[in-house]
Amino acid sequence: MDKNELVQKAKLAEQAERYDDMASCMKSVTEQGAELSNEERNLLSVAYKNVVGARRSSWRVVSSIEQKTEGAEKKQQMAREYREKIETELRDICNDVLSLLEKFLIPNASQAESKVFYLKMKGDYYRYLAEVAAGDDKKGIVEQSQQAYQEAFEISKKEMQPTHPIRLGLALNFSVFYYEILNSPEKACSLAKTAFDEAIAELDTLSEESYKDSTLIMQLLRDNLTLWTSDTQGDEAEAGEGGEN
């Protein structure tokens, strides 16, 4: 199938909310080796975000059931086996995306904006792996995630306006990484607050087409800050995450 047909099919799949099909089309487009257009990049990102999102959400539900069935051995074993099945799916999806990023997307990114977008994506998918990792594996995965976010963060500060939705989305997800994965609420808050304040200070640089995206992410940054500063008791707080714009 040629590229245009695959992209067309991906859009159809998106409208039908068949995200596995959508991801499979956009994976094929990526494997053709050319740099993706902004539209193709967003289709790829939306597809995989939904595919992995469904598994992350299932994993949380089943993990919580597994913890609640302590003492009921049969039930707990069933929940554990089901969680492990979901984990395998989740890992396969993340490894698919990370392989596309390493082989095609990051090496082919010619603009700073694309580079930041893909490095952020690399940070995100290592973070999703870190959520389900345990033991020795986890440390290496967490480091990979942090490195990708950090590299993206440095490029974004040099090359992009503080109001750019990709720079804001990166700050949002990197701060979630500090809060949820590294358990560093102070660092998470300081990163989110700085990103929010810098964007507020330069609101006049907001372009017409990204106005909605940028202000939405700023709202999410502020929501997380409110949640995290009130959450000093260390309750499990579900942080909002960046839309892939």
Curated annotation (Swiss-Prot):
Keywords: Cytoplasm, Phosphoprotein. It is found in: Cytoplasm. The keyword Ribosomal protein does not apply. It comes from the Eukaryota. GO terms for biological process: angiogenesis; cellular response to glucose starvation; ERK1 and ERK2 cascade; establishment of Golgi localization; Golgi reassembly; lung development; negative regulation of innate immune response; negative regulation of protein localization to nucleus. GO terms for cellular component: cytoplasm; cytosol; extracellular space; glutamatergic synapse; hippocampal mossy fiber to CA3 synapse; nucleus. Its main location: cytoplasm. Pfam families: 14-3-3. One of its GO terms (molecular function) is phosphoserine residue binding. Adapter protein implicated in the regulation of a large spectrum of both general and specialized signaling pathways. Binds to a large number of partners, usually by recognition of a phosphoserine or phosphothreonine motif. Binding generally results in the modulation of the activity of the binding partner. Homodimer. This is 14-3-3 protein zeta. It comes from Gallus gallus. The gene is YWHAZ.
